[in-house]
């Protein structure tokens, strides 16, 4: 082979090698089909309704200390038409609801008494302990260890009854609007004095049956009928001693009497 041909062959080989090296250094870019963006798993924002009003039969408490039981009975009657709102049932529920509190009914006792009778219940609260009940226990000369033991027992019973609890620092009237807008009836802790200036300041439970742009509509077991409170007044009434508790019952979960 002539020197000229050898030289030309070397040039060809050199060019091939260079192209091969470039191909290794810069691989061809593959076209990959884009996957659709995954949707956020965050819960959808609830759109508040302009107005909501549940038809909830009113039941007045028969004793100064049974507001929790009276409220539970009103809610249970709404989700279970067979439920009988009688004084005997009021006492039976109060004996459960009072556990974990001094006398008015704890959030766990109240939630458990509804769940035990078939309700689907959720607690919305800003506290994880006995809260104001410790102060009441000292005032009423109730043993704190006994109170704590009872409180823990009812918490466990509530969990066993599938009661869900959500802690939040922002329990507000919007929390109640959201509950009503999603078909939940709220039983709300308030200061009794905020509704009735003739009553001493004390923890008291009420049923909120609805709202509109002007007011909230409340079944107060201490009164004989539904009362109305404008938004500002209701906001001021919420909670007791900076403790805010709302017991929510899902109205879509209807309770039916078991066939024998």
Segments from the language model and where they lie:
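Active-site-adjacent structural segments surrounding the nucleophilic cysteine of cysteine proteases
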Residues: 2-149, 153-160, 169-170, 199, ...
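Short amphipathic alpha-helical surface micro-motifs
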Residues: 103-105, 167-171, 189, 226-231
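Internal catalytic-core helix/loop-beta-alpha segment
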Residues: 149-190
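Noncatalytic regulatory segments and standalone regulatory/sensor domains
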Residues: 98, 180-181, 187, 191-260
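Short amphipathic alpha-helical segments and helix-helix/interface helices
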Residues: 110-111, 173-177, 235
